[in-house]
């Protein structure tokens, strides 16, 4: 009988720079799910890749004096090197510059045009080149791009548009009445912010740059990002191309995993495209948060980007895989810090798991020469307190994996590992070993521990595929015993199993020394980044002002007491702040970078004497200070150590 299929995808990553820990999380999470499904017996297809077209790529290539293809080739090689190092078991790697993908996109575009869902029009508005986006006057924030805060220019461009409105009702039902979107809490947000106000037709072509897929029937146009990028999930299966022929086998996808910044495109635009093509919809869209550094969004421009290769070289790929998966709950942001990472590695991997394996193997060697005798003596109640949770573990883990809650799956495994360590303390094998008449009981205790190690490391092998085979070698578990079926059985190891002492699975890290060294690395990164951002001695086009003019600006610390999105403006947040003299309302274009609930209680610097202005129908009485740190990244200046009302001089 044919195996049941399972198709899982990462987003295709934009190779405008080297991969970082955020890319790593999504890919490691998908890899762990793919490995778990393979262990369950599924026919798995795991897809990842890179999204290689667009104006930004064209511009970056020009800056380096190379062709766009040569530019992306270099960065794609770095992505693949990282995935190899992190032991990512992808089955296919798609590039949007692949000929077969280009063929599929061109045919999809023509099919949507022929069906009347794509039409030709003109896009007018304020254009932001770095964001490759048009904006209406009302969407601008202080006259600038609401995405990145940069200056915009008046522009009009002939373009093709995709009709979204015909699919609004079906998409609303998809989000609210099915379990397509995980976590489900995101569904209401999408419906209220995007569907209820009315879905606007989507611009799907450009004439202002050439690095893209040409529209076959109108070669002056190239296909714009989302029709190109989203189609990868089906072009990689051979849809409308001859590269592969398993579209009917694997589609629809079982899981698309993406970060929250591209949730809208996968939750609204992608289903609409599939509906227009009369294709089945994916089963699940799993949306995760961002990994921040010490609570601050990572940015290459300020030098706080965490390089997974650097960490992996210090602690091993499996330790990094475990840490990022254990720390992030689906849908929530996770703050990365050197202290948390090292403490997690020491506590869970070195102490709990590593010590369990090393102590058990060492005692088997010490008291039985490495081979357990077949005699047994049970303590039914005490043994059951270890064996029963171990037997229930596999199905608990499977439930969490079905829900894409990898952190909870790992937590369940480590509960059983913790129970095994406690079992050692309760059974006192070092005392049993001194009494010849208790050797049968000692053999039972050690065998129970070895079986728990087998079960837990079998399940952990999906998350840490390099280290767990080392544990199996130490406990005498041959490869044929490491199966999904055996993970719910007790008594699989031979009664007279032979153990083999080996190196520590995860050596303990000197916390203070490592933190000092890592902090020094980050500091050096930040100093280098800051130096690179320093302005030249003379900045053409920027007028100098007198000190008297500058002194008219009143900068004051204010505490954010409430914050909410503005439904009519996707980029704006409405903040209530206490400036020391009372409450005032400020509207700020920071929604792409901050969630409202994360800002409440934060202290910020505001321009307190700015003339009030109305933005999208809301009065804004001031402006908060934020920095444009590059890479389409804006960061608010937080001053949590100062009381509200403090004057900034």
Walk through the language-model features, giving the residues of each.
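Helix-rich, typically C-terminal accessory recognition domains appended to large enzymatic cores
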Residues: 120, 126, 327, 332, ...
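Intrinsic disorder at enzyme termini
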Residues: 471-549
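A glycine-rich helix N-cap at a beta->alpha junction
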Residues: 75-89
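Structured secondary-structure scaffolds
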Residues: 1-48, 100-104, 148, 154-366, ...
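Cys/His-rich short segments
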Residues: 115-168, 172
């Amino acid at each position: 009988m044919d195996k049941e299929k399972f198709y899982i995808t990462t987003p295709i990553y934009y190779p405008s720079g080297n991969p970082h820990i955020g890319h790593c999380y999504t890919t490691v999470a998908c890899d762990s799910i793919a490995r778990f499904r393979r262990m369950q017996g599924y026919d798995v297809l795991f897809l990842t890749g890179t999204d290689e077209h667009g104006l930004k790529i064209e511009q970056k290539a020009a800056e380096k004096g190379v062709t766009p293809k040569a530019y992306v080739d270099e960065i794609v090689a770095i992505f693949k090197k990282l995935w190899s190092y992190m032991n990512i078991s992808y089955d296919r790697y798609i590039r949007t510059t692949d000929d077969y993908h280009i063929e599929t996109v061109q045919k999809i575009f023509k099919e949507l045009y022929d069906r009347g869902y794509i039409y030709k029009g003109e896009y007018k508005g304020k254009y932001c080149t770095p964001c490759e986006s048009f904006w209406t006057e009302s969407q601008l924030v202080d006259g600038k791009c609401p995405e990145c805060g940069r200056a915009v220019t008046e522009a009009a461009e002939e373009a093709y548009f995709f009709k979204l409105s015909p699919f609004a009702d079906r998409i609303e039902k998809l989000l609210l009445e099915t379990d397509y979107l995980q976590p489900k809490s995101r569904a209401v947000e999408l419906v209220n912010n995007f569907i209820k106000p009315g879905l606007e037709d989507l611009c799907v072509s450009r004439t202002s740059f050439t690095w893209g897929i040409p529209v076959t029937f109108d070669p002056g146009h190239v296909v714009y990002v989302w029709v190109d990028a989203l189609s990868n999930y089906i072009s990689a299966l051979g849809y409308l191309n001859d590269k592969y022929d398993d579209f009917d086998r694997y589609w629809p996808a079982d899981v698309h995993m993406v970060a929250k910044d591209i949730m809208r495109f996968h939750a609204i635009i992608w289903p609409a495209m599939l509906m227009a093509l009369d294709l089945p919809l994916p089963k699940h869209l799993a949306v995760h948060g961002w990994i921040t550094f010490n609570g601050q969004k990572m940015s290459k421009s300020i030098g706080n980007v965490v390089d997974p290769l650097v960490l992996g070289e210090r602690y091993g790929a499996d330790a990094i895989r475990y840490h990022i998966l254990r720390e992030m709950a689906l849908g929530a942001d996770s703050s990365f810090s050197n202290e948390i990472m090292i403490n997690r590695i020491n506590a869970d991997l070195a102490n709990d798991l590593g010590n369990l394996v090393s102590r058990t193997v060492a005692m088997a060697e010490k008291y039985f020469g490495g081979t357990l005798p077949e005699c047994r003596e049970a303590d039914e109640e005490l043994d059951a307190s270890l064996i029963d949770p171990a037997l229930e573990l596999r199905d608990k883990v499977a439930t969490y994996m079905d829900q894409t809650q990898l952190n909870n799956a790992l937590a369940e495994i480590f509960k059983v590992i913790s129970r095994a360590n406690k079992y050692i303390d309760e059974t006192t094998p070092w005392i049993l070993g001194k009494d010849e008449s208790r050797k049968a009981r000692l053999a039972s205790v050690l065998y129970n521990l070895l079986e728990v190690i087998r079960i837990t490391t079998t399940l952990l092998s999906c998350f840490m595929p390099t280290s767990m085979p080392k544990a199996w070698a130490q406990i005498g578990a041959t490869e044929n015993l490491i199966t999904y079926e055996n993970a719910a059985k007790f008594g699989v190891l031979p009664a007279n199993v032979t153990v083999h002492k080996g190196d520590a699975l995860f050596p303990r890290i000197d916390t203070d020394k490592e933190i000092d060294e890592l902090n020094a690395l980050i500091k050096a990164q930040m100093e280098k980044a800051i130096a690179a951002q320093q302005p030249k001695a003379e900045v053409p086009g920027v007028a100098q002002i007198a000190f008297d003019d500058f002194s008219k600006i009143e900068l004051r610390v204010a505490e954010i007491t409430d914050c909410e999105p503005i439904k009519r403006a996707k980029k704006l947040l409405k903040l209530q702040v206490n400036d020391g003299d009372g409450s005032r309302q400020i509207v700020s274009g920071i929604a792409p970078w901050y969630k409202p609930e994360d800002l409440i209680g934060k202290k910020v610097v505001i321009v307190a004497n700015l003339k009030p202005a109305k933005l999208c129908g809301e009065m804004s009485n001031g402006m908060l200070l934020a920095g444009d740190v590059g890479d389409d990244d804006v960061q608010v200046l937080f001053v949590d150590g100062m009381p509200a009302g403090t004057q900034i001089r």
